[in-house]
Amino acid sequence: MLDKLLRLGEGRMVKRLKKVADYVNTLSDDVEKLSDAELRAKTDEFRKRIDGGEDLDDLLPEAFAVAREAAWRVLSQRHFDVQVMGGAALHFGNVAEMKTGEGKTLTCVLPAYLNALSGKGVHVVTVNDYLAKRDAEWMGRVHRFLGLDVGVILSGLTPDERRAAYHADITYGTNNEFGFDYLRDNMAHRLEDRVQRGHNFAVVDEVDSILIDEARTPLIISGPADAASNWYSEFARLAPLMEKDVHYEVDLRKRTVGVHEVGVEFVEDQLGIENLYEAANSPLVSYLNNALKAKELFQRDKDYIVRNGEVLIVDEFTGRVLLGRRYNEGMHQAIEAKEHVEIKAENQTLATITLQNYFRLYDKLAGMTGTAQTEAAELHEIYKLGVVPIPTNRDMIRQDQTDLIYKTEEAKFIAVVDDVYERYEKGQPVLIGTTSVERSEYLSKQFTKRKIPHNVLNAKYHEQEANIIAEAGRLGAITVATNMAGRGTDIVLGGNVDFLADKRLREQGLDPVETPEEYEAAWESTLNQIKAEAEEEADDVRAVGGLYVLGTERHESRRIDNQLRGRSGRQGDPGESRFYLSLGDELMRRFNGATLEALLTRLNLPDDVPIEAKMVTRAIKSAQTQVEQQNFEVRKNVLKYDEVMNQQRKVIYEERRRILEGEDLAEQAHKMLVDVVTAYVNGATAEGYAEDWDLEQLWTALKQLYPVGIDYHDLVDSDAVGEAGELTREELLDMLIKDAERAYAERERELEELAGEGAMRQLERNVLLNVIDRKWREHLYEMDYLKEGIGLRAMAQRDPLVEYQREGYDMFVGMLEALKEESVGFLFNVTVEAAPAAPSNRVAPVAAPPGLSEFAAAAAKAQEQTGQGAVATKERETPAPTLRAKGIDNDDTPPLTYVGPGEDGSAEVQRSNGGPRHAAPGGATRRERREAARKQAKTSKPTRRRG
């Protein structure tokens, strides 16, 4: 129903976009008459008009006409009307659904150019580094022609290179790189270490992949935790002793385990504990669940392999080994214990954000994809994005054949090879889509046996695969590819002329970045030559039926199936698609497989005879809809829980930003001092009269905080307040606050004598920043721990989410109170020395890596032009330190681990350099490790200054 409601305004929107395209067309003649210099000068004219108050919406027709003409002059590609419509849809903050081959990459040039004119930056988000670099080079030619600067964010760049790229007018990069830079910026200890400059407008390419498929995996930066645990080994010993359906049950569809009462009693007997579910033992529940999951749900040589004493994950979608990735929440350690290999230490979360909440930071968000309609409800609900289907430039004439279903997988693959051989004989290009590398290799062997030449792609080497995909539409080309392989590159009948021309020029030693002038000079003649050759071949391919897409299995998402089909029939070309299925396929096994098997058995058909039935199609659609709904619920659930963290994250990050930007914190430090002293006094005077108060205990606690200058004996015996019984809480508080203020002023005077004027302000900044970071890390750990066990609240008829929100808020308030107390303690007691004089506060320039020098140079030039160069940076730099606080100003950076979604949506892990990591001593529960972390944080305080 929601889908239908969302589609009600589609027709009106498309008509509105058509009017925009028509208006842009009326300006074409005038723009075509302009010289190159006059066309480039339009950029400066537009910027002046924006400075004068003109709106981007008003500039749209002229800016689009200019960018369209520039693309024609530079790339020999002119935007079709439907691409202009798509560009307008993106500018207005929508998802433009454009079929494969309709030119999404070129479409993006229009809104990127228009929005970059504001000077606030545009981020173009792609699914991998290769596409980011390719698009920055390829489309960057148009933007540079118009006088804009283009940057690209790739993994492995230094902070200086990243900063230069972000200060360009348009920045290309992957979702993970943008997200991790945001998190790192909010871990920075100096303003000049931050690299991003805000979140103005983002265009997300393959928006369904990034905002839907990858949104289940949050971005996490983590560092080594303080201790490992021997509980993994203990539960790995217990799991084989427990019997399935006696001690526990397994749900393969939901991939969960549930422990029966008998199982709980068995574990309690084995461990010698009274109650597994009491608060002190609650961490053991996750160890038990993980051990049983490792036993029942994770199979060796299917889900993972063991190589050289290390557990390596196997990708369920592609079948390849995922080096460097680890399961989270203790699952990987449970498998290591099961396989009796070294159990590596758990990591502690230092910063985290979901992709949903990262992309909601942008003032305006837009996206492009060939398949968004099936996810329109989710895009609207979570991102407030409308989906606008853009008409195709030419009518679609591809023939989508009905599915063929075989009884066995072997029979299915025999039929696939026969079909491909028949097509190869007549020269028709074929693209075979598989769900795993294992199946790709199996098919490859079968093709080799039949002497069918072919290429195999497995979504690992993006650049090499893009080149193969670019030639997959040529006569007789047979290409086997996993679902994700080669995305972002068109399969053009006769070959992709842009890629073939680029390939030929690179073979001649020309490069668009290293030798731009020679490359541009040779581009047009080479392109025309390639076009003529390719068009002749394309006619031959059309004559034999165009590209044939053959799917060997249905994916759990209809979108992925549609993406595979969409490879064929681009731009009105002929084409054909068909899926071959078997009862052994994963989707069929999980849903309704038994019903279909019973039907085939009743029909008594031989294994090699397929059936085509509407019932099969309905069963598949039903199964896919169920899986899509389940995945949507998972993503919604992730977002609901992260929303609690998101509000807290905003408070902490805003506080860090204020500190980094050098805001005077004297008033804030004074308020903290008053709050902490007040809390101490309130705690000591909460009950009874003055004679009942334990002032000795209060004074002992206060002396740990600051050098108290008054004696409580004198206070009680003083004539100022009369008898002890006449001392009021207000009088006591007033005297102690005045005493604390005196001590703080004395501390400030001492520091200024040691390190000069402003030393106390600098210490306040350093202390607050470090304490905030430590307390936030501790809080993230506590919140992880809370979320792990919150599901058990459902057993007590309580809503886990409501409980998480309530307890999470209480923990956050408690953390802020502890933050004040620890900050005040550090400000008084930390040992301080004058900082050694630094030879220079300027950062030495870093050379850009090969292929990126132009981006770095262009960005540096942009900084100068926009006033964000050396002068602007100097104003925003953190002042040079004049003092050093022991235990706080620590330059050592621990090795960090980055977890984010891979292209297939599963978690991908990268580690920064930090030396070898060793497992810490075991034997502690997670709660004990948490306590140890807290104690270590406290003991890191140096010897305090005596008052």
Curated annotation (Swiss-Prot):
State the source organism's domain of life: Bacteria
Q: Does this entry carry the keyword Transferase?
A: no
Q: Where is the composition biased (Basic and acidic residues)?
A: 925-934
Q: Which GO terms describe its cellular component?
A: cell envelope Sec protein transport complex; cytosol; plasma membrane
- Ranges for region Disordered: 860-947
List, alphabetically, the InterPro entries matched. Helicase_ATP-bd, Helicase_C-like, P-loop_NTPase, SecA, SecA_CS, SecA_DEAD, SecA_motor_DEAD, SecA_preprotein_X-link_dom
Which residues are listed for ATP binding in this entry? Answer: Q83, G101, E102, G103, K104, T105, D490
Per the record, membrane topology reads: Peripheral membrane protein
This enzyme catalyses: ATP + H2O + cellular proteinSide 1 = ADP + phosphate + cellular proteinSide 2
Which EC number applies?
Answer: 7.4.2.8
Keyword line: ATP-binding, Cell membrane, Cytoplasm, Membrane, Nucleotide-binding, Protein transport, Translocase, Translocation, Transport
Q: Where is the composition biased (Basic residues)?
A: 935-947
UniProt-listed GO biological process terms: intracellular protein transmembrane transport; protein import; protein targeting; protein transport by the Sec complex
Q: Which Gene Ontology molecular-function terms are recorded? A: ATP binding; protein-exporting ATPase activity
Question: Taking the first listed entry, what is the main subcellular location of this protein, grouped into a coarse class?
Answer: membrane
Q: Where in the cell is it found?
A: Cell membrane; Cytoplasm
Q: Which SMART domains match?
A: SecA_DEAD, SecA_PP_bind
Subunit (UniProt): Monomer and homodimer. Part of the essential Sec protein translocation apparatus which comprises SecA, SecYEG and auxiliary proteins SecDF. Other proteins may also be involved.
NCBIfam families from the UniProt entry: PRK12904.1, secA
Q: What does this protein do?
A: Part of the Sec protein translocase complex. Interacts with the SecYEG preprotein conducting channel. Has a central role in coupling the hydrolysis of ATP to the transfer of proteins into and across the cell membrane, serving as an ATP-driven molecular motor driving the stepwise translocation of polypeptide chains across the membrane.
Q: Which family does it belong to?
A: Belongs to the SecA family.
Q: What's the name of the protein?
A: Protein translocase subunit SecA 1
Question: Which species is this UniProt entry from?
Answer: Mycobacterium sp. (strain KMS)
